[in-house]
Amino acid sequence: MRLLITLGPSGSTHGHSLHTDAGRRRGGRPFAQVVDELRAGQRVRTQGLKGAARGHVLARLHGALRAPLVCVAVDEEAADALAADLSFFLGGQGSLLAPRVLRLPADEVLPYDEVSPDAAAVTERLGALFHLGQGTRFPALVLSVRALHRKVLPLAVMRALAARVAVGQDFDRDSLARRLVRMGYQNSPLVEDVGTFSVRGDLLDVFSPLYDKPVRLEFFGDTIESIRAFDPQSQRTVDALKEVDLVPAREVLLTDETRPRAESAARAVADRINLPTIKLREQLDALREGLPGFGMEGLLPGFFEDGLSTVFDFLRDWSPEAPVIYLDDPLGQDRAADTLWEELERSHGAAEARQELICPPLEHFLSREDVNQRMQSFRVLEGGGLSLAQTERPPVHFSFGGTQDLREAILAHHGEEGALSPLVERLERWRELRVACVVACGTLSQADRLKRLLMDRNVMVKVHTEPLEDAVALYEPSIRAHLFTGEVSHGFVDGPGGLAVLADEEIFGARARRRPKRSKKLDAFGSGFGDLKEGDLIVHTDFGIGRYAGLTKMEVNGVPGDFLVLEYAGRDKIYLPVGRMRLIQKFSGGDPTQVQLDKLGTTSWEKTKKRVKEQLLKMAAELLQIAAARKAHPGHAFSAPDRYFAQFEADFEFEETPDQAKAIEDVLADMQKPEPMDRLVCGDVGYGKTEVAMRAAFKAALDRKQVAVLVPTTVLAQQHFLSFKKRFADYPVTVEVISGLKKAPEVREILKRAKEGKVDILIGTHKLLGGEVAFKELGLMIVDEEQRFGVKQKESLKKWRSQIDVLTLTATPIPRTLHMSMSGVRDMSIIATPPQDRRAIRTFVMKYEDTVVKEAIEREVARGGQVFFVHNRVESLPSIETQLRALVPQVSIGVAHGQMGEGQLEKVMLAFTEKKYQVLLCTSIIESGIDISSANTMIVNRADQFGLAQLYQLRGRVGRSKERAYAYLLVPSRRAVTKDAQRRLEVLQNFTELGAGFSIASHDLEIRGAGNLLGDKQSGAIAEIGFDMYAQLLEEAVAEMQGQPPKVQIEPDVTLPMPALIPDDYVSDVHQRLVFYKRFSQASHPDEVTDLRAELVDRYGEAPDEVDHLSELTLLKIDMRDLRLRGLEVGTTRLVVTLGADALLDGPKVAGLVQRSKGVYRLTPDMKLIARAPQGASGQDLISEAKKVLRDLSHCALPQA
């Protein structure tokens, strides 16, 4: 039987016959024709091949021809979309080592732009070239016109430098390290970033661009004994490997071979352009130092004997089966090539005028003629758009149906409970026509959400966790939709193929696209001891604030040990054994230059601690009082989220971060309780706090309750109004704002409607707290940046807190330690995970040039955007303003700085948010909460004078929309920047993923945040005693107010007759030694000690005896802390345990132990237990004896111990 039904766009009945015969379904005449013509070696033109249908057809083409595909798109954005479509139909993107769809990215900058290219793009390109050069088999390579024209590292160089290293292979470790330097890797004490390596003893760590994790090679002599992948954050092994491929880490390779060639190329260019000797010397110095500075890319072809290679050279050797080249939108590609060459000529001309040392464009890029000529030896398929090339036959027509009408039908019902009805009806119609429907969901959680929404409507769906392998074999009569994770550009209907594909964006609206990236958690373990430098302030629990003066070796009773030298007022010193590092913290929380050192032998430190503790007890009492009043006051218990709420959640255009999802869960759980909510949500700008507030507001509106949103400034009021309005546009929720911008009659009208219950969400400044504002049924108050309100406003907020649900938001990061200390008195949710890059901010480090500034501003303004120009000196702002007005006279410029009056500053900021200015020239004052999605370029002048954390905060002000954001970090010429600053600027360039340097810098921001949250008085206390001590005292105060017994903390003093330390020749980096000492001293469970020793072995090789002794000493201390014993002295003839008055021991039981021991134990009047050591015992025997003594004492412990 043959069933004939016709199906056109979106399921309408015309267009193609649809057969039940699976074989015919797979073919389809246009497809078969394309296959036949390509097999015959012809250039094939198609029409109607666009969107995700391209991926579908190309994937089938790969299967039919068994040939790899080289897919060329107009630009990088189009290449990303094409790669996503292909990945979806080719069974996923694969991994870095076994790719299925590989991207060969181009640089956004030209070699003459004085800007080093984006490091992530460089490493991704080198990885792709390696795979091509090695002949790795994979289905598809995707690149843009620019990447196809751009010349690349010579194939011979890639092959000569790349190294495959395997377990069991003989390889001289030092020669491998030298080879890595030649390949552009940088030696670093800790391997956290791509392109770095480190040598320690028998270990070599290296992070190759081919892997998403660094690897650790362990040598035995010259033989590689093991290869292990490790986590760059924890530095611990995660996987064992048999072999590893090492590829060049950068393109500007300054090696012994390339440097002389680069120098002679530089001299030749200098002679041709008559370059002054001083300028030539500066460039040659940079080359000799091996510093890849700005603009060195322009000379790159001169580094190699035969110049650079082309992508075609790599393609020729890639696959035994000649690849098929697919040109997407050939006419668009012609235009892109024209534009590229226009930009090249212009940029080259400008560089020549600046007398830069550069090679001509044809040495960097292929001409259009070259590309066309080289393409003639490949089979070519054209699709999408028009073509200018002549082909022997007319174009092959594909006529896929679209899904636009379905999108429009869903939009027409958006915000209503039945919004998904058009989708449900369409799925039913497709099922009747035996069409399998596939939905590409951006994430697994989005797939689960859509499944719930459809299952609620009795629609059977299936969520697939594996990538899509064969779309044609999917049809199942009972399943209406198959949900896969992945992205497609937009949907299509293939009637004859029995397949309909939808993007989740067509159901829920546009979502932010992301490219996968190497993950890096931002967390500074070891409480900042990894960067403790001589001269830094520390806080000792018993002696107060001192200065760290280094790590030194000393002998005590003939036993060597490591000691921290701590300096106090009057040059007094303490030598602290590393085993007692638990007693100190790095000082943070105030200006180090204003801090006074404590004086040893006085009571001043104890008095300060006592005073702060009294303050804290008062604060804790107040907080607990508010919490108690809240619990006593019955509030409104909101209903649980329903189907309609789930639809609102699904409309969120980003994937929730784990912290954000947890905050939403916390808030909704609080709202469902009968007592009023009082929750604080902390998170940096852009971390998604507003969405948490919007979910709470929607829940309140669904329960017919009104919401007040209180903000500190008119600017933020206006911003929140616009973002709430946009988010609730498709729902029956009324949002209004009252602020200084509204005329009095308008305000009166809004207030009247609020009183009548006709306004669901009212946003405003402190005016909302005034007597003239009344609500019919207020159920939720959202407070943004509470610390910026005055005392009076804070007092009225206290009154509200015990009556209705209050949700407070703050952009200031809050440290986890403070969060822990305050648990029980303040409900807090911390959003510490940054959102996955909407699109990574392109960060350029470059020399200040007027042309750079002019082009950056003009480029942003031309696409309708705005620019922040940050200059941190108020006194020179007017001269910068004059300079900018001369450079870009047609652009409107606003000026903002902290010395302006608040009203004036607010006016300028508001005008900028309303797009009345295109450029905002400002100091680093840019308001913390400000979110201007149209401002996507930031220029920072003298970036070398900013700290990492400050630059991170600034940079977070751009990149808040789907537009690509740019950050230009401008520095003076190379001569004015120190070598150290230059290396730091390289870190800044890889800024999309910050390493430990940022984690530590962020600590300071958190401390500032703690002060903001707790108020000025508490900031003063933090500055006086340091943050960690403050958090500890706060925890004690809260426990005391809650009636818990005070914790007695004892730090036992243990001496062993053998060295217990980490030898310098085992861990040579002093910072890493300090981190390990700190972690050993903090260990509170035997498992932690076992893990620490295992980590040392993993990272540094087999542990020497001294490390084993340190582990044993730490284990003894853990047992002693449990019993609150003060000291233990292990000698060759006896062991002495100092019990002390706080010991958790039962006196009679200890006396009984001594009596039963028959002279082995004796107790002295000053509470010391002396045990006789076995004759001739030493080393491990003595430690075993010490453990036995502590075990005996544990049998005498008081019941509560």
UniProtKB/Swiss-Prot annotation:
It comes from the Bacteria. It is an enzyme of class 3 (hydrolase). One of its GO terms (cellular component) is cytoplasm. SMART domains: CarD_TRCF, DEXDc, HELICc, TRCF. CDD domains: DEXHc_TRCF, SF2_C_TRCF. GO terms for biological process: regulation of DNA-templated transcription; transcription-coupled nucleotide-excision repair, DNA damage recognition. This is Transcription-repair-coupling factor. It comes from Myxococcus xanthus.
